[in-house]
Design a protein with these regions (language model features):
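Active-site phosphate/pyrophosphate-binding segments
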Residues: 2, 6-45, 134-136, 141-258, ...
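Glycine-rich phosphate-binding loops that contact phosphosugars or nucleotide phosphates
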Residues: 27-28, 36-185, 213, 254-255, ...
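Short basic/hydrophobic patches in alpha-helices and adjacent helix-turn junctions
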Residues: 229, 281-285, 330
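Generic C-terminus detector
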Residues: 303, 312-347
């Protein structure tokens, strides 16, 4: 078993431990959160780099659905260009596996000491953990170059934080997390059955686009990063709506299009999900090959490979989607003669 495969296989157990911790009383102190900002509810700014940033999309989408202002900002861009955005009602949530990336250290040096800050971090002795008003541990275990456990753990921690900010009971989130963990276990157990046909369908594309909407954009962005890091393939994440405004012009049989389509919890979201299925059909019609991860019915069509996924609420679909993509990129790397999870240039 490769090191990356071992990391992938550990995710259900790690998330189970995380669930137990964050359902314990006082894991996220509501009174402590309230004292960090002048006005409540706050304007929540999630920031991170790479998978740490992408992990925030479900929490941001959830808070927005509750009428709470929330943004996701890349840390490097935030510290260089948007520092003056912060005000007395801003709650800054910094997500970082190490807690000591160059961008995070620069942000810590630039912020006023009175800025209310929550750290979601895997290294509890890091500079970020020491500076934050509240530390929420990722509990992802030993760090690895490719974000597997750290990504899925960050998604779950941020959702528990979002529920606490919205002052909602955590039970529905915990139920959804347990469901996602069970789905992960099934996918990993069926790896040898599910992934090889997908590898054959995927073949060797010269361009990959990953498309979705809302909270599931996390799957598109994290998936694109995994394609770059593991099998060293060029991949572009994008909003499915944005794809129709120009990028459709480069649809090509040599390209692969990955669409994440999950049933929404509101009428508006369900309409968007139907749009994702229509997009899959349109890409196929124009000659593209589509890998469709969906919990919605879709016709069995040539050049579309449907991977049914378990429906899961509370924006946690990415916990399932990402395991599918992790296994796919792992096997694509092996097929290309690469060591899965080994970096050539980045540290």
């Amino acid at each position: 078993m490769t090191t990356l495969m071992a990391e992938i296989a550990e995710q259900p157990a790690v998330l189970s431990g995380l669930r137990k911790f964050y359902t314990s009383p006082g894991a996220i102190p509501s009174k402590g959160l309230r004292t960090m900002v002048r006005d409540w509810p706050p304007t929540v700014v999630f920031t991170g780099m790479g998978s740490s940033m992408y992990a925030a999309y479900p929490a941001q989408a959830y808070l927005a659905s509750q009428g709470i202002r929330a943004l996701v900002w890349e840390t490097g861009d935030l510290v260089d260009h948007h520092r003056k955005f912060f005000g007395p009602d801003t709650l800054l949530v910094v997500v970082s596996q190490s807690g000591e990336t160059a961008e995070v250290l620069r942000l810590l040096g630039a912020l006023p000491t009175k800025e209310g800050m929550v750290a979601v971090c895997n290294m509890e002795t890091s500079a970020l953990a020491r500076r934050a008003n509240l530390l929420l541990p990722m509990m992802a275990g030993r760090p690895a170059p490719v974000g597997t456990k750290t990504y899925t753990c960050a998604v779950a921690v941020l959702m528990y934080l979002a529920v606490a900010i919205a002052r909602k009971p955590p039970h529905p989130l915990t139920q959804s997390l347990m469901h996602a963990i069970e789905a992960q276990e099934k996918i990993i157990d069926r790896h040898d059955e599910l992934t090889p046909p997908t590898v054959e369908f995927f073949d060797k594309p010269n361009y990959i686009a990953l498309l979705s909407r809302g909270a599931d954009l996390a799957s598109a962005y994290q998936g694109a990063l995994l394609f770059k890091e593991v099998p060293k393939m060029g991949a572009e994440p994008m909003s499915a709506a944005q794809f129709r405004h120009g990028p459709m012009e480069i649809i090509n049989p040599a390209h692969r299009y990955i669409i994440f389509a999950r049933k929404g919890e509101s009428k508006l979201k369900r309409e968007a999900d139907n749009g994702l299925l229509r997009l899959a059909g349109d890409i196929r019609k124009h000659g593209g090959r589509v890998l469709l991860y969906a919990d919605l019915p879709f016709a069995d069509l040539t050049n579309v490979r449907l991977i049914p996924v378990e429906p899961v609420r509370m924006g946690l679909g990415t916990l399932i989607d990402s395991v599918h993509i992790q296994l796919l990129v792992h096997d694509l790397a092996l097929r290309a003669g690469l060591e899965p999870g080994s970096f050539r240039f980045a540290g």
